[in-house]
Swiss-Prot record:
Organism: Mycoplasma pneumoniae (strain ATCC 29342 / M129 / Subtype 1)
Pfam family, one: TsaD
Protein name per its UniProtKB record: Uncharacterized protein MG208 homolog
Example GO BP: tRNA threonylcarbamoyladenosine modification
Lineage: superkingdom: Bacteria
Residues passing through the membrane, by range: none
Native organism taxonomy: Bacteria, Bacillati, Mycoplasmatota, Mycoplasmoidales, Mycoplasmoidaceae
Signal peptide (UniProt feature, chain positions): none
InterPro entries to which the protein is assigned, alphabetical: ATPase_NBD, Gcp-like_dom, T6A_TsaB
Amino acid sequence: MRFFNKYKLFLDCAYKHLNIVLLDFKTNTVVDQLTIPVQQNLTELAVYHLEKLLKKNKVRNNTVRQFYVTTGPGSFTGQRVGAIIAKTWCTVNPNCQLFALNSLRLQIPYGCGISKISAGNEKNYCGLFTETTSEIALLAKPDFVKLCKANTELPVYENFENIDSIEELFLNNIERFELVENPQNLELLYLKDPVN
């Protein structure tokens, strides 16, 4: 009988980049990763690059045992694309567990901090994360400034700009992802209505 390696797969397309990270299941060693900016055709690009990365590394779909996805806030299209791929993957491959984490929490590499993702129209998705607090809100710029002034001891992370790598963020937060028992019950984090 032939045995295949097992893997963990991370997909994030909730903001301005398509991020894919493939990990060895046992060691959490990065096998491969991809980060590319996307503006158009996200659905086609996500599926194409995911298939390409798996083929390049000779990974069979049924050897991915854990699928990690971000739930937003961020791009409405990006959130939905990530969710659809994750739900479909775990439904078709029932031995694969689904884990989810919001994008604001993912942006903070270590423990505590203030996370901000631009929401357009002078507003920001903001998260305050301490040992005892986990608050998420849509804030206008003056309110974000107040939040930062009230928490000067916390580092601020903005728009995934001051990070070393997405794989580092993923690895540092892997224990914060929550198991989604039924993939069809995956919920996305929307803080504002879609733009018409």
